[in-house]
Amino acid sequence: MNKLIPLPREFFARDTNLVSTELIGKVLYFQGTTAIITETESYIGEDDPACHAARGRTKRTDVMFGPAGFSYVYLIYGMYYCLNFVTEDEGFPAATLIRGVYVISHNNVYTIDTAKIKSQITDEKTQSIIIRKNRRIMKFYIPNLKASNLYLNGPGKLCKYLGINTSYNKCDLINNKDFFVSDIGLNLPYYSTTRIGITKGTDKLWRYIVTDPKMLY
């Protein structure tokens, strides 16, 4: 695969729902593992009752107030970590929660041909990607993990697989060679639905999911 280039800060410093939708199909790179983002969720401002910032600016939520393009990682239920990317203009608290990814490489060894995926979506010619066949990603024990062991459908699962915890909170995703988001030209179809795992703001259609994750298998 061509060298991955981090998205600019300007990408994140925009309307959160726009960022959340455009993150679908982008790739998350974390310490040698590359994964296609397949599901996101928006949390926007102090008027969003489900947003952590609805409780005001605290030590925990300070990162949400910007600047954009930083990671916001927190622990829920005392056992699961959640990865978010800070969005919007500095001073306005908002973030996109990364709810699902499809892992395509581990230790920089690719297991699927993303060019083939792209060709299924668009008629444009795509550049070949070198794949080392018969190499599988390391398996980790994650409860309820789907059989593929690659499609991580849940924020806790993806953080556990990648090894993301609160030590990676407030990481700059722009000036970083080990932890960032990149665009490889995938424009995956998606749909919007209500957010889950919350008790307030459940009417917002701010959750975005790849229409058919099986296109990545």
UniProtKB/Swiss-Prot annotation:
Q: Which cysteines are joined by disulfide bonds?
A: none
Residues in coiled coil: none
**Tagged with keyword NADP:** no
Q: GO molecular-function annotation terms? A: alkylbase DNA N-glycosylase activity; DNA binding
One protein family per Pfam:
Pur_DNA_glyco
Instruction: Return the EC number.
Output: 3.2.2.-
Q: SUPFAM superfamilies recorded for this chain?
A: FMT C-terminal domain-like
Q: Which InterPro entries match?
A: Formyl_transferase-like_C_sf, MPG, MPG_sf
Residue ranges of every copy of the RPE2 insert domain listed in the record: 105-145
**Alphabetically, which GO biological process terms does the record hold?**
base-excision repair
* Record flagged with keyword DNA damage: yes
Entry superkingdom: Bacteria
Q: What CDD domains does the database record attribute to this sequence?
A: AAG (cd00540)
Q: Which UniProt keywords apply?
A: DNA damage, DNA repair, Hydrolase
The similarity comment for this entry is:
Belongs to the DNA glycosylase MPG family.
- NCBIfam families from the entry? 3mg, PRK00802.1-4
* Stated name of the protein: Putative 3-methyladenine DNA glycosylase
What organism is the protein native to? Rickettsia prowazekii (strain Madrid E)
